[in-house]
Structure formats: structure tokens, C-alpha cells
UniProtKB/Swiss-Prot annotation:
Any one cellular-component term (Gene Ontology): extracellular region
Name of the protein in question: Basic phospholipase A2 homolog TM-N49
Broad class of where this protein is predominantly found: secreted
Lineage of producing organism: Eukaryota, Metazoa, Chordata, Craniata, Vertebrata
Disulfide bond in keyword set: yes
Pfam families named in the record: Phospholip_A2_1
Amino acid sequence: MRTLWIMAVLLLGVEGNLLQFRKMIKKMTGKEPILSYATYGCNCGMAGVGQPVDGTDRCCFVHNCCYEKVTSCSPKWDQYIYSWENGNIVCGEKNPCKKQICECDKAAAMCFRDNVKTYKKRNIFYPKSSCTEPTDTC
């Protein structure tokens, strides 16, 4: 619970990418991202480790891998430009690095939407001590 509180406080002051990502997830899934995904499974939240527990957790794994490929800017903090067109996210950033961040977030938000049926409340606050199988390579 303390981790959730810290994350909520941190996100209140964030005007960069994490807030944008939160808005994408909320619009795509209807779920409050901080409460629903920040501590979900083995790969969602601050430290992803181990095999994904389900499709939702796999979305986080893939998102983490996507962020690892972004090397010339800061994926968690750099703002980017995007819009909504007919219910779809359109990344409009001209800066290639920021566009890549937007595409990572867009793919994850769509993945959460597409895997909403795999989402299980029991995987919130999933014990990281249960994430013992080796992590897949990106």
C-alpha cells in the first residue's frame, strides 16, 4: 500500500510522459492506472522481473522492453505530442525519440485494452517473491 501511495504522490506532480501514459490507459480501459496496474503481476510498476503472470502482465513486459530500446531521451519523463482520432491514439511527435516513447505507450495502452479479459484483481499487489522464473529476453 505504501508503494501505491508513493506512486500516486509522485504522479500528482508529473506533467511528462507518465501522466500522458496514465491518460491513454484510462481512456482505453476505463481503469484507473495507478490503482489497477502500478503493482500488477511481475512486470507492471517500478521493477519488472520474472515471467508474466497473464496477458495483462505481458503488456507491461513488452512496454518495459520498448522503453529499454529508447536510448536518446528519457521515456518516463519526456513529454510528447499525441491526439485522439475516432477513439485511436495518434502519435504526432516530430522528434523521433519522443515519437518512439509515444508509440511504446500507445502499444501498451492498446495491449491493456485487448487483454482486459485476462485482468484479475488477485494480481494487484502480486508478491514479487513469487516472480522467480527467469525473465524472457526482450
